[in-house]
Amino acid sequence: MRIGYLLNTYPQSSVTFVRREIHALERLGWQVHRFAMRSDRAALVDPADVAEYDRTELVLQAGAPRLAKAALRLALTRPHGFARALARAWRMGGRSAQGRLRHMIYLAEAAHVAHRTEALGLVHLHAHFGTNSATVAALVQDLGGPGFSFTVHGPEEFDSPQALSLGEKVAASAFAVAISWHGRSQLSRWAAYADWPRIRVIHCGIEPGRFPEPGPMPAEGPLRLVTIGRFAEQKGQLLLPEALAMARARGVDLHLTLVGDGPMRAEIEAAIARHGVADAVTLTGWLDEAGVRRVLADSHALVLPSFAEGLPMVVMEAMAAGRPVIATAIAGNPELVLPGETGWLVPAGDAEALADLFATAAATPAARLAEMGRAGRARVMQRHDIDREAARLARLIEEAMRP
């Protein structure tokens, strides 16, 4: 079966879970054509992402004249479908902060994608994220292209669900996917009750084969913590220097490694200096998947101080690497992190509670940390094997294709 995947920006370092899902579908024998509106080749550091770039069709590279021509052609040859798509784009644009003009651009993008899906013989479109990628997928369907489904991740979609017309997108789709039960509950808030059966839970996943049996915990030196993610307001990294300083004031010996980059890097560096913890912090920048696994192997635990989340891939990766997780008790985190079993949960935004858990982790014997890591590894392998989750997605697509 030939299907299309549609994203706004792909590939990029923060959506490696999409790549893993696509590859898992291809291992099942499916042919997947990648569409993205754009991608930044210069920003890619992982060789696997570079390879994906070469396999991805970038819609905006077609240029404005070609997109406009595709829209005009469909307006003339499929006037009823074009009228439906135009009405949807106008309606959605009226709700959105991006406005109706931007949605006319989405309509032109959809016309181009509809033409390409027909030329490629694609029978279904799956969009990731409930943002403009799902909008374009819905418009492609209106224009006479294949049916569509989409995956909602959060937290961004849940910040502006009405502006994104999430309820309308669920109603128009063959099915909608949430990556956690928390995500499904949030999507259900904006979908009509009659459409709730369309909303299914399929987890993002890891490739178990890439995570061999964990090595031993670091035997000497301070408690080694690592945090991984984009330096953005929702990830809460600004809280870490304060919590680190509090823990050190109590005599806790620890070191923190921050993996990632982003718009808040300067503020994070300033907070590190302000709290006097520069000697206990390492910033690595972005690392590829192999680099992330090396950092996890050199740590005792992952810390994730997020203010908003979906269901973080870094939690899955840390657990697969046999490392306990300190995470905020928000969104999908409690679906993975079991307090006292696979890690610890902390109220979001509470630096003092974070410092308490740093002290708790530092006082926990290495053998117990390793035991918690093994429990986490078993849990994530059972719940987040990407081949198993992709097979569930494939069955939903197959069901959607039945008359």
Residue ranges and their predicted role:
Residues V170, W286-L287, R294-S299:
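Short alpha-helical donor nucleotide-sugar binding micro-motif in glycosyltransferases
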Residues P324-A327, V337:
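Short hydrophobic beta-strand element within catalytic cores of glycosyltransferases
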